[in-house]
Every structure is written in C-alpha cells, then in structure tokens.
C-alpha cells in the first residue's frame, strides 16, 4: 500500500477501551461487541472471552489487558477498523488501565444502571481524562428490576461532569443497545493522529513470553510503519533486533504484512531476555531512528512488600525464573533476593496492592507448580536516624536498632469510600479504628455518600477491604491514592522462640496497639506451634523489653513407669537424669515453625481490635 492508501486507512481506525467498576458488565459488553462484529464465530464464543487466564474466569475479574482488532461496517456503508483494548477494573490494576488508555483515543464508560457510579469508576475516568480521551457513557444492565437509568445519568453529570444526554442505554447480557454503542464509536472517537511517513515510533504497552519465539511485544504504532525484516531498536537501551513477524489479535494471533500508524498489534523479533524490553518503552527503526522517545506512562511504584520463599529450598531457581516470566508482562512486579534465618533463600517482592499480591501468589502456584510461604505484607517506612540519615525500609527485619531511630514516617493514603447512607456510621467507625483522619463527606444523591479519609497504608494492606465489605454488607466501594508520609509512633516488634528471634515473624506496629498485638500473637503461636520435648517460651519484644510471654509446656515421658514401688531415691535419680537431658536438649534444640505461624501475623488484626 502506498502512503495515500495508508492515510485513508488510518482515518477508518478507532482505538478505544472499556472502563468500568468490577461487575458493571465490562467483559460481557466486550463479548457482545465481538459477536456483533462477527469477529468470533458463535461456535468459539464463550463468556468472558477476553479473560484468558483461568484465574480471571474463576474470580470474574479482568487482570491483564487484551487488545483485539475488529471490523465493523457502519450505517454509512463504510467499514471501520476497531481496536478494542480491554482493561481491568480493580484498584490494584490501575497501572494496567493507564497502559491501555495510553494506546487509545476513546473510552466507553460502563456504569451499572442499578448501582450507579462507584469509587473505581471515578478513578478510571480521571485516568481517561488525563489522557485526553473522548469518553462515551453507557448505562448498562437496564433490564434489571432495580435499574434506574435516569438517576444514573444524573450521577454521571453531577459527579463526573460528563454530558449524559446522549448516553446509550444498554444491556450487554440481552444484547440491547450494542449497535448504538458501535455507531457512537464511529462518530465520536477521533481517528489516530500520526504520520505514516515519519520515522517509526511504537509504544510497547504489554509483552508476552513465548517459549519458541521469545518475547512478543504488543505495540501501538504512533508514527511510521513496521514490517518483517526491519531492524528495530529500543529507545531506552539502544538494543537492536530483527523483526520476524508482525500481526494483530482477533483474539488469536494473525500474521500481517505490516503494521502502520494507528494500528495496535504484536511484533516478534527473537528477543531472548525479559530485561531487554520494558513496557512503556518506544520502538523505532535502527536505520532511521525517531528523534525522541514517546511520552510513556509513569512507572508504578510498589506499595506493598512481602517475602516469598519456596517451601522446598531446591526450588529457589525455579522461583526466580517464574518471577522473571511474570515480571515480563507485569511491569510493576519488583523482586530482589533475600535470605531469612527461619525460611532460607527467597525473594522480597513489591506489589501494587493486596489483590495484586494474591494474584501473583496464585499464578506462581498454578502456572509454575511452586509451593510457597509468604510473609506478612508490609509497606515502605521512612526511618530517620539519630545521625540525620533517612533510610527506606520495607522489611521489618531490616529496621535499625531502636536506639538509633529519631523518628519514623509512614505512608498515608487518601481513601475514597462510596457507601449507602445507612452504613456511614459503620464506615466512619472502621476508618477511625484504623487510625484514619476524617477529611470530608459529600452526598452523591439522596441515598449515597462519598466519604474521604486519610488512612495509614499499613492499616489498609491488612484487611481493610474485607472489613469494609462485611460492615457495609458488600455495598461500599473503595479506591485509594498515595497521599503523603507522616510521622507516627511506630515500633518494631520481634517474636522470640526459645530465646531466638524469628526474623520472618517481626512486624511494625503502632505503639498504642503494641501490647495488645504482642499478647494476641504469642497466644496464637502457642496454639499453632507443636509441643517439643522441652519447654519453649514464646516472647514478644520491643528492643530489649519483653511485652508478652507464653510458654509451650514440654512433652514428658514417664521415666518412672518401670519402677513398681521401691526406693524414692531411685525415682529421684531417674527424674534428675531426665531433667539434665531436657536441659541439654533445650540448649541446642531448635523449634520447627509451621506455615500457619507466619499467616497468624496477618490475621491477628481481627482479634486485636474487637
């Protein structure tokens, strides 16, 4: 095709994504669009078609983004090329959303006609506005008995400030309004800008590892054209590769002769190592490079850290390989090797949130068959020492000695909670119990309230979300952004078994709750750790000070069983001998700590504040 034809083709391209809160019907809408445009035959059709991971289908959530090309013949008789980029809706996967939005010109905002706007909807809309996208509101599930499309349209106008007069009323499940949505995409979403004759600039928004072809890049072509045989160059590190294949997804990969400006597809170039490609990097041609890289998206910083250790120590290298493969298309997962006296060799991993941590753990166990021990999650603290240094600490066992600490700052988040009016009291009580500071409260409509609190991230990573759902019968929706670091009265609590510190059980706690939590955890460990041949003291300590203690009584063999009557001094001699043996055993004996003990540090929060 010459450049005139390519420019004409470019005018027919529409790149869009679907943004919505969990369960508002995003994946179902994507399924209907695929059916309507006959991208997928009815024989291949299955629910949640784009959620290809087992985990996504089971949990009913979208974790990874997906990009698909569809052809749609509009009412004006022209055939348009649509690129649908499916995005996740959960707060932990916001970076996936921002990546997919960077590859689009428009976004379909799906709002449930019964539930209305939720916290996560708002967060994603702001991301779309940051990327200057054309937003098309769709009120979904209008066939539900509880649907109230008028109220929801008012919410869209009042809360988000979008004009909802032309919002499409649809039901993805029943297939109502799908054609209207497709027509609006044609009319309202702008065609991609960019110059086919300019040097190649392609944004990498995802990558997948293929055992035979190496790393396969998913790209959005912003300027220029790429075809097999070209020599491409990564702009961040200057490495070059020969393109072996380019193509699109329909959802299956289909090879093409070229990818031109505005296209969204894949590039295979025998890239062997994961480290050579970074999501957000710009690809250009080695012989005619672009002058500057594209404005990528900001690197997401992990908010939650935890240690991951293989239960069988010989699986350490397998775990490293598995993490590297996951990191390939999950740019926000970070890890570095660490050792623990209690757990051996493992990795300290950084995650965006608890769901992200959960998903990574499940993927490691399922896809790579590795049995893991996870330590309690912690956040990044700023520890200011007496010699005026500031250390960032994400692992409690790396905390400096208390005598060297001047003060500690912890991260606070701005939590936005949307909840029906009757549960406002429960939400405020929970937030205050989690050391939250009230900021403001707005009424969205007669019944729903938007409550904003500043809460320490450390309190949120434990079980804030579960507690919030249970105290509001599942009606609350929740979203948070990093806010600032603040001074807090924090201390490090160590757990000692038989006088030895167990590094993997250490945790950071607010001074106010230290005694309570120490007491709860030693009692929990007493129940979990099996009895030994000798007595085992369990102690909770802050620095040198023991704040709680509990003893596991020794198992005792009855050495007097074979003495029928007889001299008391004979019995005493046997008992003394047993006592000396126990003493020697206690001095050299080590205590096996079961997996549940590490998890009990996580769940102690339940009891600490009842």
From Swiss-Prot:
- Cellular component aspect of the GO annotation: plasma membrane
Residues the record lists as binding GTP? 23-28, 140-143
Q: What does the record give as the reaction this protein catalyses?
A: GTP + H2O = GDP + phosphate + H(+)
Q: Supply the alphabetized keyword list.
A: Cell membrane, GTP-binding, Hydrolase, Membrane, Nucleotide-binding, Protein biosynthesis
Domain tr-type G, by residue range, is 11-193
Matching SUPFAM superfamilies: EF-G C-terminal domain-like, P-loop containing nucleoside triphosphate hydrolases, Translation proteins
Report which superkingdom the organism of origin falls in.
Answer: Bacteria
Q: What is its EC number?
A: 3.6.5.n1
Query: Which cysteine pairs are covalently linked by disulfides here?
Result: none
What InterPro entries is this protein classified in?
Answer: EF-4, EFG_II, EFG_III/V, EFG_V-like, EFTu-like_2, G_TR_CS, LepA_C_sf, LepA_CTD
EC class of this enzyme? hydrolase
Q: What does this chain do?
A: Required for accurate and efficient protein synthesis under certain stress conditions. May act as a fidelity factor of the translation reaction, by catalyzing a one-codon backward translocation of tRNAs on improperly translocated ribosomes. Back-translocation proceeds from a post-translocation (POST) complex to a pre-translocation (PRE) complex, thus giving elongation factor G a second chance to translocate the tRNAs correctly. Binds to ribosomes in a GTP-dependent manner.
Q: Which family does it belong to?
A: Belongs to the TRAFAC class translation factor GTPase superfamily. Classic translation factor GTPase family. LepA subfamily.
PANTHER family with a match to the protein in the record: TRANSLATION FACTOR GUF1 HOMOLOG, CHLOROPLASTIC, TRANSLATION FACTOR GUF1-RELATED
Give the HAMAP family listed for this entry: LepA
Tell me the protein's name.
Answer: Elongation factor 4
User: In which organism is this protein found?
Assistant: Streptococcus pyogenes serotype M3 (strain ATCC BAA-595 / MGAS315)
């Amino acid at each position: 095709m010459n450049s005139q034809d390519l420019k004409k083709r470019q005018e027919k391209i529409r790149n869009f994504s679907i943004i919505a809160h969990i369960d508002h019907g995003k994946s179902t809408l994507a399924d209907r669009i695929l059916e309507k445009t006959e991208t997928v035959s009815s024989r291949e059709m299955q629910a949640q078609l784009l959620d290809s991971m087992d985990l996504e289908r089971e949990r009913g959530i979208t974790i990874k983004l997906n990009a698909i090309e569809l052809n749609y013949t509009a009412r004006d008789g022209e055939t348009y090329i649509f690129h649908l980029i499916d995005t996740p809706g959960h707060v932990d996967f916001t970076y996936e959303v921002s990546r997919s939005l960077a590859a689009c010109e428009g976004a379909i905002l799906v709002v449930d006609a019964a539930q209305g706007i939720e916290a996560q909807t708002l967060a994603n809309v702001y991301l779309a506005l940051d990327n200057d996208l054309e937003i098309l509101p769709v009120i979904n599930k209008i066939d539900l008995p509880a649907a109230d499309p008028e109220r929801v349209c008012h919410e869209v106008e009042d809360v988000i400030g979008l004009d909802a007069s032309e919002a499409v009323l649809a039901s993805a499940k029943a297939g109502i309004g799908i054609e209207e949505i497709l027509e609006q995409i044609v009319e309202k979403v702008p065609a991609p800008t960019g110059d086919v004759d300019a040097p190649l600039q392609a944004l990498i928004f995802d990558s997948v590892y293929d055992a035979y072809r190496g790393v396969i890049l998913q790209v959005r072509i912003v300027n220029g054209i790429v075809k097999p045989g070209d020599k491409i160059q990564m702009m961040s590190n200057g490495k070059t590769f020969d393109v072996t294949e380019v193509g699109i997804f329909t959802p299956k990969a289909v090879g093409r002769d070229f990818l031109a400006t505005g296209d969204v597809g894949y590039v295979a170039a025998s890239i062997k190592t994961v480290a050579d490609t970074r999501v957000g990097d710009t690809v250009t041609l080695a012989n005619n490079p672009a002058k500057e890289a594209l404005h990528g998206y900001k690197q997401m910083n992990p908010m939650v850290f935890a240690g991951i250790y293989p239960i069988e120590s010989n699986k350490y290298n397998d775990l490293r390989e598995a993490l590297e493969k996951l990191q390939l298309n999950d740019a926000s997962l970070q890890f570095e090797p660490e050792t623990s006296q209690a757990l051996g060799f493992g990795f300290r991993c950084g995650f965006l949130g608890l769901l992200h941590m959960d998903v990574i753990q499940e993927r490691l166990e399922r896809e790579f068959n590795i049995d893991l021990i996870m330590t309690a999650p912690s956040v990044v603290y700023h520890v200011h020492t007496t010699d005026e240094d500031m250390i960032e600490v994400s692992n409690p066992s790396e905390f400096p000695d208390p005598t060297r600490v001047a003060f500690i700052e912890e991260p606070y988040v701005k939590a936005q909670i949307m909840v029906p009016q009757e549960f406002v009291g429960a939400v405020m009580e929970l937030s205050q119990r989690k050391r939250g500071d009230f900021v403001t409260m707005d009424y969205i409509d007669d019944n729903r309230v938007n409550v904003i609190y500043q809460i320490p991230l450390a309190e949120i990573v434990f079980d804030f979300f579960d507690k919030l759902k249970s105290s509001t019968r599942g009606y609350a929706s929740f979203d948070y952004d990093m806010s600032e670091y603040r001074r807090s009265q924090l201390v490090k609590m160590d757990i000692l078994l038989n006088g030895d510190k167990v590094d993997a059980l250490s945790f950071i706690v607010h001074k106010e709750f230290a005694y309570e939590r120490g007491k709860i955890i030693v009692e929990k460990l007493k129940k979990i750790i099996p009895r030994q041949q000798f007595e085992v003291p369990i102690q909770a300590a802050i620095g040198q000070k023991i704040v709680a203690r509990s003893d596991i009584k020794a198992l005792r063999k009855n050495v007097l069983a074979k003495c029928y009557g007889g001299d008391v001094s004979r019995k005493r001699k046997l008992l003394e001998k047993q006592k000396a043996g126990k003493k020697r055993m206690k001095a050299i004996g080590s205590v096996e700590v079961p997996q549940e003990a590490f998890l009990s540090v996580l769940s102690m929060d339940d009891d600490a504040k009842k």
